[in-house]
Regions:
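N-terminal hydrophobic/helix-forming segments and targeting peptides
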Residues: 1-465
Length: 465
């Protein structure tokens, strides 16, 4: 190739590179340190409640205080508010008025899981089980025959709330059984999404009876006695409980080279942690920087702790009131990075991806101009100017990024909180970490992509305009 053609190619054509061809040794060390901290966050926060607690603890260590309505705030002040124990909003007050807008990163900290039903405990054939109702878009067959924990709370009539933790390392864990292949012929002929019906996702919780042999439900009684002895609860208390079955495995490095992280809950705690950590690591920004860690995204962002809730508006309104700024003025000048994961190209399932418009492992933070399904249904389609703004911001900050869609046009689709932020008249763009095996009990991400997403969040918070 002539030098002229080489120069023309470099001038006119994209030349995406594997991020490892760009990072130096110091950056690689920073990446590893960041990912070590992220794995600790994952292990501490297997539910939205636990994630919120871990985030609050980290924030308070860095000088954040709980916001009280009417609190006088000045540039550099760091505040947070917790939404019913399951969502979190944090802010670092900027030098400029909120009339100039805010720089927002909105992620979610709920993940697909199995929730206990209100009346979960039963006995059948002298084995005790918990009935579950799956939460979010799971592939049901992936949840059988893996070790599970039970985490959550039981709210009692007297107003007390009991934390429940069953199945940590070294303790007895729970499991959902599956059919042996010797008798699985009929099951094997069913479509994959029908082979394991939702009503069969029952947690095996005991088999040892107590009492006399003629008594009924002796195994169920034994399980309930164990729970009462440890937590002081009765069967009736399940009616006011939020108990979640989540994978027991901890976050681990993946690959002979240790270049990836495998864990439950990357979607979307990988972006939630990046946004949180970026906010904790900045000094006084020009514009007020806001991190949102929302609940209920996996089921449509509904409810008081979801992104459609007025809780976010109330928090921002309180901040604006302190500066005599109308909330609508802040929103119309604000920018939001809807921080959610995207699908990483998997060559084992190449038929559902459009390779030219897919996110690749180790190519950095994945921008998504739109999500949705088929004809962009349910999408927040960012305008060209918004994408250009982030391109320039990331390039100036040295962030490695790529742009992608979720998959082939008619192969499926997905959504994020972007539409709910955009509906508030906030300029919004989706961006996040590419994930392999998304929504599985054990997902995989690249360490490099995690680190670059953190850098991208930090660049948004530190933006001058």
């Amino acid at each position: 190739m002539s030098e002229e053609m080489k120069a023309l190619r470099e001038q006119l054509l994209r030349n995406d590179k594997n991020g490892y061809d760009t990072l130096d040794e110091a950056q690689l060390r920073e990446m590893e340190a960041y990912c070590t901290d992220y794995k600790a966050f994952l292990n501490a926060g297997k539910t939205e409640r636990l994630s919120a607690r871990a985030a609050i603890a980290a924030a308070e260590e860095r000088g954040f205080v709980q916001y009280k309505r009417g609190m006088a705030l000045k540039a550099g002040d760091k505040v947070y508010t917790c939404n019913r124990g399951k969502g979190l909003m944090l802010a670092v007050i900027g030098k400029e008025s909120l009339a100039e807008g805010a720089q927002i990163a909105a992620a979610h900290i709920d993940s697909p899981r199995l929730d206990l039903k209100p009346t979960p405990l039963y006995e059948d054939s002298e084995m005790a089980y918990f009935k579950t109702h799956y939460y979010g878009g799971i592939r049901k067959y992936q949840w059988v025959t893996i070790p599970l924990q039970l985490r959550g709370v039981v709210a009692k009539k007297d107003g007390s709330v009991v934390d429940v933790c069953i199945g940590e390392a070294g303790e007895p864990q729970l499991v959902i059984t599956d059919l042996l292949p010797h008798l699985g012929g009929e099951q094997g002929r069913k479509p994959l999404n029908e082979a394991v019906p939702g009503e069969t996702l029952n947690l095996l919780v005991g088999s040892r009876p107590i009492g006399d042999s003629e008594d009924k439900d002796r195994v169920k009684l034994h399980v309930m006695k164990r729970l009462h002895d440890k937590y002081g609860i009765t069967e009736s208390d399940f009616a006011s409980a939020e108990l979640e079955a989540v994978p027991a495995a901890e976050a681990v490095d993946i690959g002979i080279d240790g270049s990836m992280i495998g864990s439950y809950g990357h979607d979307d705690r990988v972006c939630g942690y990046a946004a949180l950590r970026a906010l904790l690591d900045i000094e006084t920004p020009d514009k007020t920087a806001v991190c949102v860690l929302a609940d209920k995204e996996e089921i449509g962002s509904m409810g008081v702790t979801g992104m459609q809730s007025a809780a976010f508006d109330a928090f921002m309104s309180d901040l604006c009131d302190g500066q005599n700024v109308p909330l609508k003025a802040c929103f119309e000048n604000a920018f939001c990075l809807s921080a959610d994961v995207t699908a990483a190209y998997d060559p084992n399932f190449a038929e559902v991806y459009e390779k030219r418009n897919s996110a690749f492992v180790n190519y950095g933070m994945g921008l998504c101009k739109y999500t949705g399904a088929r004809g962009k249904s349910g999408a927040s389609d960012a305008d060209a100017e918004t994408v250009a703004y982030i391109r320039n911001l990331f390039d100036e900050a040295g962030v490695i990024w790529q742009i992608a869609e979720l998959g082939k046009v008619d192969a499926g689709g997905g959504g994020t909180v972007a539409m709910y932020m955009a509906n508030r008249n906030i300029t919004t763009l989706d961006a996040g970490v590419p994930v392999l095996s998304m929504h599985a009990p054990f997902e995989t991400v690249s360490k490099l992509d995690c680190y670059e997403t953190y850098k991208g969040m930090k660049a948004v918070f530190q933006a001058e305009k």
